[in-house]
């Protein structure tokens, strides 16, 4: 059960950081920056 909680926390933290960086930068070319 602990592994599940730690995995969820890790994923949520990475998601928050990703969204923070994504919304921080001005979306100049969204299609090229996605992949």
From Swiss-Prot:
Pfam families cross-referenced by the UniProt entry: PsbT
Function: Found at the monomer-monomer interface of the photosystem II (PS II) dimer, plays a role in assembly and dimerization of PSII. PSII is a light-driven water plastoquinone oxidoreductase, using light energy to abstract electrons from H(2)O, generating a proton gradient subsequently used for ATP formation.
Disulphides: none
Assigned protein family: Belongs to the PsbT family.
Membrane topology, as annotated: Single-pass membrane protein
Broad class of where this protein is predominantly found: plastid
Subunit architecture: PSII is composed of 1 copy each of membrane proteins PsbA, PsbB, PsbC, PsbD, PsbE, PsbF, PsbH, PsbI, PsbJ, PsbK, PsbL, PsbM, PsbT, PsbY, PsbZ, Psb30/Ycf12, at least 3 peripheral proteins of the oxygen-evolving complex and a large number of cofactors. It forms dimeric complexes.
Entry's transmembrane regions: 3-23
GO biological process, any: photosynthesis
Entry keyword set: Chloroplast, Membrane, Photosynthesis, Photosystem II, Plastid, Thylakoid, Transmembrane, Transmembrane helix
Gene Ontology cellular component list: chloroplast thylakoid membrane; photosystem II reaction center; plastid
HAMAP family assigned to the protein according to its UniProt record, in alphabetical order: PSII_PsbT
Gene for this chain: psbT
Protein name per the record: Photosystem II reaction center protein T
UniProt keyword annotation of Membrane present: yes
Localization: Plastid, Chloroplast thylakoid membrane
Cited InterPro entries: PSII_PsbT, PSII_PsbT_sf
SUPFAM superfamilies: Photosystem II reaction center protein T, PsbT
């Amino acid at each position: 059960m602990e592994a599940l909680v730690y995995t969820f926390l890790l994923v949520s933290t990475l998601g928050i950081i990703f969204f923070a960086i994504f919304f921080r930068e001005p979306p100049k070319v969204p299609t090229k920056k996605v992949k």
